[in-house]
């Protein structure tokens, strides 16, 4: 039934989707009520968006069937709503945020619209009256959009709804209200397509109905599988209340699902008094009453989906026809809201009323069929149900025949298409149920067949034609799927084609039945069947069945299809057997023949020995093939006799080459292991050793040595690459911290001035510290620093400057100054003390936000002084200067800047001030910096800052 529910919820899904548009209401009514009206109301109220997608799970317990039900317990935040859909990055924790919704962005398979979750619309949807709107095209389209998820929920809801009479009754109520609306809407659409409800029921059933038929076929899949077991069981509970016909609707295949919905109206002849509920209501009430129980569920869902059911239900008397026509028509109609017609509804109701007698008779027929079915094996029961479905549909067909007569051929065509689809569905059902169907259906067809014989013949013939194509491959496909497939195919077929097909099938079947044109037959058959339908139809059906049996299973299949409308399952099954025996069988045979012809050689050779195959192949060889073979033979002969082989196999030969190559490679590798080793060594490691050691050896010379080394090493691509990397990185960093670096540079320049005028030793000690720190950081910095060191040194024209660079970036920037200072500084003074360092800290501060004079310097200067002078600092300086407006200063002044600290320190000063301002410490350092010696007048303030920085650092 899950599938039945699926299909029901398929069509109902459209409805339910329409209804589901406000499924909260829909569900709250049907599902919620099944759970409890209070809860549904509460849910409706509390969960504005009871809609499957948006209401918080706790509010949407009703929707538990949903796979996502997790969200029921996941807070309406990202959790509840989304069944664990990944929230995605920018979703934040916004529970319902549009794109913050749980379902990725706009992912709402079932979700109506994310905004609907909270949107008043959902609230409105919750409100039942708005739900009534749900059948409206908007709802419908919405339903279609959310068809899958809606159908999922609808299916679950369907199951729920069908499970709970309460829900079903509510469904019927809702249907009565909704379907009244629907029937109004559907009636309007029906009027729009006066014929359209019957035909549209078919056409829509074929188009939208096909989807619904497909859904129905899904539905019917379960019911064929669980023909009586599941479908019948759940429907049987409903059906038990209703006549066997009702039950057969319960068991009906896709149409049966639909028919079940419609059939409930059919049984609704009994509930017919409940037409006041509106057909839908009747159907709902009927459905609740019996087959309506499940049918009602289906119908409730279906009716939900198709207000059109209400028209069919309006003539609940026309049990199957209303059910099928109404359900499918309604389904279709709801989907094609524009296509219904009130006139059609009236006409259809009248016809169905006319048919109601037939339906009742057909119910009897169904009962007979059911009995027959019951007599038959369980499959027979399924077949009986199929028959009953066919019968159910047959009454519909009968109803629809006058319907067709009264309504335009389009109605026929649609109806025919629908029947064709039904036939396809039922045929596929008949695949599984065909044999049983043949038994039960023929019996049930006794009742229904006269009515539907021609129709069934036409429809079934069409089905068989399609089926012959399909049955060949699909013969044993699950009827539901097959039906779906066929329905889809039929749907794909233009309705005219279908009509033609059906007419053609019926004409060919007409030979069997005598009714040639399906449309005419349907009109005639409907009228005649209505007349015959009472009691003669069963006999005629039996006779037809017998005839079909005599004619072959196929005609029965066809009449089965008519009956398939009435007792579709039976018809289906017969169709299957008959398909094989009859046109379908003939087609299958023809196809087999064609296939065999196509693959005849294969088949023949299949069992031959390989030698036979070879012989046949040789005999079949073309001259060119023979010529080529001849040449090949000659070549082999010549090679064998005239060209002796070296005795070495190809493998050996190539192995030899490989060995040679390997040996050569090994030799090459052995030749220059150091190159590889050096390359293998990471530049940072290399630099660590080279720079750190050189720098540590002597602050000045290491700068030289390192610089010389790296200058020599510039050949080392690692350094070059590292240099580039570091330069780029530093350029970026400098771009960012250019001010910082510039401040550093200015700090360095100022520091140079300060150092020159001031304590070089402080600077030296400090820079030694910094240099060591920088050596560490530089080693960590890796080659780029070393490269920078090289560049720095390269840029540092003076050795002293280079040493100072080595001593620190500050020094290189400071310039030569007293390079005794660098040594002294490096050796003697703690960086912190040195104002130069303060400046370094200043620039360091610039980069490091001047956390520590020493630390800032260490941060920057921690790159070993070599680094500072080396790449990061001097080249950085150069780079900064290249990038900076002070570029001329940067490159040229670097060398002279220490000396020409005046100009540079000013620039530095600017940066320094900026830096100092940047660093909270700067103010502190500035004030405490006064302690430091401000020897550089130019750098005075900066020196002061740097002093402050340095001194605090030192201090």
Curated annotation (Swiss-Prot):
Where is there biased composition of kind Basic residues? 14-51, 121-143, 762-775
Segments carrying the region annotation (Required for mRNA splicing activation) are 2-190
Q: What outcome follows a substitution of residue 408 to A? A: Reduces phosphorylation upon DNA damage
- For the cross-link Glycyl lysine isopeptide (Lys-Gly) (interchain with G-Cter in SUMO2), list the residue numbers: 202, 215, 221, 252, 333, 346, 353, 375, 387, 389, 396, 401, 421, 427, 451, 455, 461, 467, 470, 481, 486, 527, 551, 558, 602, 697, 705, 709, 711, 756, 759, 876, 879
Give an example GO molecular function: DNA binding
Residue numbers carrying Phosphoserine:
220, 232, 237, 240, 243, 248, 253, 257, 315, 320, 323, 326, 339, 377, 379, 406, 408, 444, 468, 535, 560, 562, 575, 619, 622, 672, 682, 684, 698, 928, 939
Protein name per UniProt: Thyroid hormone receptor-associated protein 3
Residue ranges annotated as compositionally biased, kind Acidic residues, are: 930-940
Q: Compositional bias of type Polar residues: which residue ranges?
A: 204-220, 282-300
Q: Which gene encodes it?
A: THRAP3
For the modification N6-acetyllysine, the affected residues are 221, 346, 455, 470, 481, 519, 527, 558, 811
Q: Which residues carry this modification: Asymmetric dimethylarginine?
A: 66, 101, 108, 845
Per the record, which residues fall in region Disordered?
1-94, 117-559, 663-955
Residues annotated for ATP binding in this entry: 552-559
Q: What does this protein do?
A: Involved in pre-mRNA splicing. Remains associated with spliced mRNA after splicing which probably involves interactions with the exon junction complex (EJC). Can trigger mRNA decay which seems to be independent of nonsense-mediated decay involving premature stop codons (PTC) recognition. May be involved in nuclear mRNA decay. Involved in regulation of signal-induced alternative splicing. During splicing of PTPRC/CD45 is proposed to sequester phosphorylated SFPQ from PTPRC/CD45 pre-mRNA in resting T-cells.
| PTMs per UniProt | ADP-ribosylation during genotoxic stress promotes accumulation in nuclear speckles.
Phosphothreonine is carried by which residues?
324, 397, 874
């Amino acid at each position: 039934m899950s599938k039945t529910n699926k299909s029901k919820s398929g069509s109902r899904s459209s409805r339910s989707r329409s209804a589901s548009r406000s499924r909260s209401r829909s569900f709250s009514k049907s599902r919620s009520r099944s759970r409890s009206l209070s809860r549904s109301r509460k849910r409706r109220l509390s969960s504005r968006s009871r809609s499957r997608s948006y209401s918080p799970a706790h509010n949407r317990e009703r929707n538990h069937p949903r796979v996502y039900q997790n969200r029921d317990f996941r807070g309406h935040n990202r959790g509840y709503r989304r069944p664990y859909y990944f929230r995605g990055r920018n979703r934040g924790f916004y529970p319902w945020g549009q794109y913050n919704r749980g379902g990725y962005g706009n992912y709402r398979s079932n979700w109506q619209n994310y905004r609907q979750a909270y949107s008043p619309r959902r609230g409105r949807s919750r409100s039942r009256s708005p739900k009534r709107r749900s059948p409206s095209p908007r709802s419908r389209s919405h339903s279609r959009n959310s068809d899958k998820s809606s159908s999922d929920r609808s299916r679950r809801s369907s199951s729920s709804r069908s499970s709970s009479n309460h829900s079903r009754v509510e469904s019927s109520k809702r249907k009565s209200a909704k379907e009244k609306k629907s029937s109004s809407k559907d009636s309007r659409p029906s009027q729009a397509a006066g014929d359209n409800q019957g035909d549209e029921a078919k056409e829509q059933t074929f188009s939208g109905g096909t989807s619904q038929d497909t859904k129905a076929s899904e539905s019917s899949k379960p019911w064929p599988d669980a023909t009586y077991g599941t479908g019948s069981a759940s429907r049987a509970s409903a059906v038990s209340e209703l006549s066997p016909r009702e039950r057969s609707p319960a068991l009906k295949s896709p149409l049966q699902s639909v028919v079940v919905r419609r059939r409930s109206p059919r049984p609704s002849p009994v509930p017919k008094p409940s037409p006041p509920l509106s057909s839908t209501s009747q159907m709902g009430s009927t459905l609740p009453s019996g087959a309506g129980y499940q049918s009602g569920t289906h119908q409730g869902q279906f009716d939900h989906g198709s207000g059109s059911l209400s028209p069919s239900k309006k003539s609940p008397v026309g049990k199957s026809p209303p059910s099928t026509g109404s359900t499918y028509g309604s389904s279709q109609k709801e989907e094609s809201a524009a296509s219904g017609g009130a006139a059609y509804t009236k006409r259809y109701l009248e016809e169905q009323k006319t048919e109601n007698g037939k339906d009742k008779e057909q119910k009897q027929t169904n009962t007979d069929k059911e009995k027959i079915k019951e007599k038959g094996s369980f499959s027979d029961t399924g077949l009986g149900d199929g028959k009953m479905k066919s019968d159910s549909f047959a009454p519909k067909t009968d109803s629809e025949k006058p319907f067709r007569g009264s309504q335009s051929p389009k109605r026929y065509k649609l109806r025919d298409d629908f029947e064709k689809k039904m036939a396809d569905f039922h045929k596929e059902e008949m695949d599984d149920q065909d044999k049983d169907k043949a038994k039960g259906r023929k019996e049930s067809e006794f009742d229904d067949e006269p009515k539907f014989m021609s129709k069934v013949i036409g429809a079934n013939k069409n089905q068989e034609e399609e089926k012959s194509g399909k049955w060949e491959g699909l013969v044993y496909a699950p009827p539901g799927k097959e039906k779906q497939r066929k329905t889809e195919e039929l749907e794909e077929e233009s309705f005219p084609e279908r009509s033609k097909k059906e007419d053609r099938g019926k004409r060919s079947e007409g030979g069997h039945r005598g009714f040639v044109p399906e449309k005419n037959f349907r009109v005639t058959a409907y009228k005649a069947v209505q007349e015959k339908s009472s009691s003669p139809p069963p006999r005629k059906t039996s006779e037809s069945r017998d005839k079909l049996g005599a004619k072959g299973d196929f005609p029965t299949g066809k009449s089965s299809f008519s009956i398939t409308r009435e007792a579709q399952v039976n018809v289906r099954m017969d169709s299957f057997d008959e398909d094989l025996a009859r046109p379908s069988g003939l087609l299958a045979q023809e196809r087999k023949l064609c296939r065999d012809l196509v693959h005849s050689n294969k088949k023949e050779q299949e069992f031959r020995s390989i030698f036979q195959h070879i012989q046949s192949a040789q005999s079949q060889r073309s001259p060119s093939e023979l010529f080529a073979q001849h040449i090949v033979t000659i070549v082999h002969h010549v090679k064998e006799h005239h060209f002796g082989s070296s005795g070495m196999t190809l493998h050996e030969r190539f192995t030899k080459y490989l060995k040679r190559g390997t040996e050569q490679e090994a030799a090459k590798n052995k030749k220059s292991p150091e190159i590889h080793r050096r390359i293998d060594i990471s530049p940072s490691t290399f630099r660590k050793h080279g720079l750190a050691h050189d720098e540590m050896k002597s602050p000045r010379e290491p700068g030289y040595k390192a610089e010389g080394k790296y200058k020599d090493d510039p050949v080392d691509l690692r350094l070059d690459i590292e240099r580039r990397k570091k330069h780029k990185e530093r350029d970026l960093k400098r771009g960012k911290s250019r001010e910082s670096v510039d401040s550093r540079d200015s700090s360095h320049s100022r520091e140079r001035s300060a150092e020159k005028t001031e304590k070089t030793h402080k600077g030296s000690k400090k820079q030694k510290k910094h240099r060591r720190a920088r050596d560490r950081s530089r080693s960590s910095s890796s080659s780029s620093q070393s490269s920078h060191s090289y560049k720095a040194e390269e840029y540092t024209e003076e050795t002293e400057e280079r040493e100072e660079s080595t001593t620190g970036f500050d020094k290189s920037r400071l310039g030569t100054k007293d390079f005794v200072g660098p040594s002294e500084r490096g050796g003697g003074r703690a960086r912190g003390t040195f104002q130069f360092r303060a400046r370094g800290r200043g620039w360091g501060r610039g980069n490091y936000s001047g956390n520590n004079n020493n630390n800032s310097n260490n941060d920057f200067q921690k790159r070993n002084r070599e680094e500072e002078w080396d790449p990061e600092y001097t080249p950085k300086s150069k780079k900064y200067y290249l990038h900076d407006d002070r570029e001329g200063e940067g490159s040229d002044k670097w060398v002279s800047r220490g000396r020409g600290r005046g100009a540079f320190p000013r620039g530095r000063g600017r940066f320094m001030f900026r830096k100092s301002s940047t660093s909270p410490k700067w103010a502190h350092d500035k004030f405490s910096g006064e302690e430091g010696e401000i020897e550089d007048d130019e750098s005075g303030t900066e020196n002061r800052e740097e002093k402050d920085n340095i001194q605090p650092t030192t201090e």
